């Protein structure tokens, strides 16, 4: 059972819809009345300004036509003549003042200080933001080199050659000159033939002594152990394999053949 539309606070209720429409109509009427008052005030101000201007224009001939010796019934104005003749009033250059005003307005617009009523932030800027520019105009003036230009520069052999030449020039400039280089030590004089011969004889004598000592050690072991045993060819009678101490390996036990019956 759908009872939601039956609620009094429902937005689609007939009473609420009618109330909203009535409020909208009242708001439109109030807006129209406000605009009418603004227009009426502007019209009255313009009319008053024109009336004052007409009075000032007609007051000068009346003063000239009046007798200067006749006493006036109003208060005495000592500065009337100066104001009428525009004397003593500093006059500025209108063009210069207008130019200064435009320059100040341009600076304030560039800084974002001066914004008019109803003007958005994008309109206040001198140049539209990047997200409002069309695709073609975004890429027309990129801040840096484009990807295609980077690839061309990387694959250009002339650019590569210039880079290597610049490195070579830099290394040659950083390398010290011949005068600044430290003088290398002169190589020693080659040894004489007698010295080389003596060294060779000394090495040969040392090798010969080492070989004789080795042979003497082997012969001494043979004399102590006696005659060297002949190498056994039978696999069953050979000693067990011992990599480090073959003399300590024992023979396998000999098996006596069984007599045949």
Swiss-Prot record:
Region annotation (Disordered) ranges: 1-261
Keyword tags: Coiled coil, Phosphoprotein
Compositional bias (Basic and acidic residues): 12-38, 78-109, 147-163, 171-211
The keyword Nucleus belongs to this UniProt entry's keyword annotation: no
InterPro entries linked: CIR_N_dom (IPR019339), LENG1-like (IPR039875)
Bias (Low complexity): 212-228
S-S bridge residues: none
Protein name according to UniProt: Leukocyte receptor cluster member 1 homolog
Gene from which the chain derives: Leng1
């Amino acid at each position: 059972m759908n009872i939601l539309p039956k609620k009094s606070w429902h937005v689609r209720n007939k009473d609420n819809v009618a109330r909203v429409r009535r409020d909208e109509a009242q708001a439109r009427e109030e807006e129209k009345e406000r605009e009418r008052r603004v227009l009426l005030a502007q019209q009255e101000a313009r009319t008053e300004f024109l009336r004052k201007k007409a009075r000032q224009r007609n007051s000068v001939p009346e003063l000239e036509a009046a007798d200067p010796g006749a006493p006036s019934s109003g208060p005495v104005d000592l500065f009337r003549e100066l104001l009428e003749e525009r004397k003593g009033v500093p006059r500025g250059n209108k063009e210069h003042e207008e130019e200064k005003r435009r320059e100040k307005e341009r600076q304030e617009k560039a800084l974002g200080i001066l914004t008019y009523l109803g003007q958005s932030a994008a309109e206040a800027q001198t140049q539209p933001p990047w997200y409002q520019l069309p695709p073609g105009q975004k890429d027309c003036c990129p801040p840096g080199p484009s990807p295609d230009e980077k690839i061309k520069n990387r694959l250009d052999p002339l650019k590569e050659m210039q880079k290597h030449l610049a490195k070579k020039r830099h290394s040659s400039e950083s390398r010290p000159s011949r005068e600044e280089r430290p003088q290398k030590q002169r190589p020693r004089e080659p040894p004489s033939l007698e010295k080389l011969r003596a060294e060779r004889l000394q090495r040969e004598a040392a090798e010969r002594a080492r070989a004789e000592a080795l042979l003497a050690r082997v012969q001494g072991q043979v004399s102590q152990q006696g005659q060297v045993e002949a190498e056994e060819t039978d696999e069953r009678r050979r000693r067990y394999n011992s990599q480090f101490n073959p003399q300590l390996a024992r023979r396998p036990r000999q098996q006596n053949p069984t007599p045949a019956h």
